Amino acid sequence: MTKPMTMSQKILAYHAGKEYVEPGDLIFANVDLVLGNDVTTPVAIKEFEKIGIDRVFDKDKIAIVPDHFTPNKDIKSAQQCKMVREFAKKYEITNYFEVGEMGIEHALLPEKGLVVPGDLVIGADSHTCTYGALGAFSTGIGSTDMACAMATGKCWFKVPEAIKFILYGKKTGWTSGKDIILHIIGMIGVDGALYKSMEYTGEGLKSLSMDDRFTIANMAIEAGAKNGIFEVDEKTIEYVKQHSTKPYKIFKADEDAEYSQVFEIDISKIRPTVAFPHLPENTKTIDEITEKIYIDQVVIGSCTNGRIEDLRIAAKILKGRKVKKGLRCIIFPATQNIYKQALKEGFIEIFIDAGCVVSTPTCGPCLGGHMGILADGEKALATTNRNFVGRMGHPNSEVYLSSPAIAAASAVLGYIGSPEELGMKGDEE
C-alpha cells in the first residue's frame, strides 16, 4: 500500500511510472504537452539543434504560440517569429498557431482542448501554471528544458511540497477570482509558496467559474509556487467536454495527504483588492484605499484576465459611460475566439463608444513589450499579473493590479475606484 499523496504528487508519480513520490524526490517524467512562445522558443530551437536529431518526440504534443511581440513589433521580433515559424514547418508541429488564429498562449491552449485533467504540461513561460485550473500539473521551465523535452518527451522534476487552500462561502458583490488570488498573495507573500504546489479544494469552488479558476491558477507563480491546481469537479468536466476530445484522468488528493500548511478561506468575506507597486503582495481592499490615486492608463486583458467573462464584466460597467478624458484604456481579448464572442455580444462597440482602444490578442504591454508602454512617472491600473519596477515600461512608472471590474470603473472615474462609486451593485444585471 502506498503512502497518501497530494494531487500534484499523484500526477507526477503517474507520469514517472512510480507508485509513490514524496516532496524532494528528483524524478524524470513523461510530459503530455511542451509549450513555447516567440520569446522562449528561439533559444530552445538553438539548443534543440545542438542535440543533432532530425525529429521531435511527438509533433502533436508540442504547442508553439507567438504571442509576446506579435503582430511583430520590430525587426528583431519579426526575425524571432520567422525562426519559430520555419521550425514549426520543418518538424510539422501540429499545434503551431500563427497570427490570425492565435491567442495569448495560456488562454488559447485550454480553449483548443490541448490540456485536460491529469495532464503533465511544461512550458517555457512562467505562467504555464494556469492549466492547474483543469486539474493538470503544469509548470514553467527554461528554454533548455524545452529543447530536451521536444527531443525526448521527458523532463526532470523536483517533487514539491503542497499548501492546501480550503475555500468556502460564495463570492459576493464585485469580487472575482482575481480578488481571491490577490488576497491570498497578500496574505502569504510573493515567496509564501516558494517551490510548492498551491492546491485548491472546498465547497467554495462551486462559486468559482472556470475563468475565475484560470485566473487563480495563473498567478500561483506570483506567490513563488511551482504550480497551482484545482480539485476537479462538475464545472471542470463540463468545460473539458465542451473543448476537448482527449481522454482525461482525475487525480484526487488522499484524505490524509501531508501539507506544509493548510489555509481555510471564506471567500464571501473577500472584497475587491488592488496590488500596489511594486509587488503583487502589496495589497489593499478597495475600502482601504483612502486617497484618490489618479491613473494615466488602464489595461484590461492578458493571460490572467482577458477571457470572455472578464470582457463581459468590463462591458457591463463601461456601457453608456465614457473613459475619463486624458486617460487611455486598452482592451485585449485573449484569443481570436474570445474577440469574436465579444463582437457577437456587442462588447467591442461598447468599448469603442466608451473611448477604449481594442487590440488583437497579444501579451503586449503586460511585459513592457508594445501596444501601451508607460512613460516616466505614469501610473497604470492593469488586470495583468505583475507590477514589478519597470514591468510595463519606464522604470519610474507604476503599475497597480486589479480585477476587470475595478479596472473598468477606474477608467471611467479617472482614479482607482469601484463600480459602487458609479452606483452599480455587484448583483446588477
UniProtKB/Swiss-Prot annotation:
Signal peptide: none
Pathway connected to this protein: Amino-acid biosynthesis; L-leucine biosynthesis; L-leucine from 3-methyl-2-oxobutanoate: step 2/4
One GO term of the biological process aspect: L-leucine biosynthetic process
PROSITE patterns for the chain: ACONITASE_1 (PS00450), ACONITASE_2 (PS01244)
Cofactor(s) needed: [4Fe-4S] cluster
Enzyme's top EC category: lyase
Positions bound to [4Fe-4S] cluster: 303, 363, 366
The protein's Enzyme Commission number: 4.2.1.33
SUPFAM superfamilies according to UniProt: Aconitase iron-sulfur domain
Coiled-coil regions, chain positions: none
Reactions catalysed: (2R,3S)-3-isopropylmalate = (2S)-2-isopropylmalate
Entry superkingdom: Bacteria
Keyword Secreted attached: no
Pfam families for this protein: Aconitase (PF00330)
Cofactor binding, per record: Binds 1 [4Fe-4S] cluster per subunit.
Record key words, sorted: 4Fe-4S, Amino-acid biosynthesis, Branched-chain amino acid biosynthesis, Iron, Iron-sulfur, Leucine biosynthesis, Lyase, Metal-binding
Gene3D superfamilies named in the record: Aconitase, domain 3
Entry similarity comment: Belongs to the aconitase/IPM isomerase family. LeuC type 2 subfamily.
Subunit structure as annotated in this protein's UniProt entry: Heterodimer of LeuC and LeuD.
Role noted for this protein: Catalyzes the isomerization between 2-isopropylmalate and 3-isopropylmalate, via the formation of 2-isopropylmaleate.
Protein name stated in the entry: 3-isopropylmalate dehydratase large subunit
Species name: Caldicellulosiruptor bescii (strain ATCC BAA-1888 / DSM 6725 / KCTC 15123 / Z-1320) (Anaerocellum thermophilum)
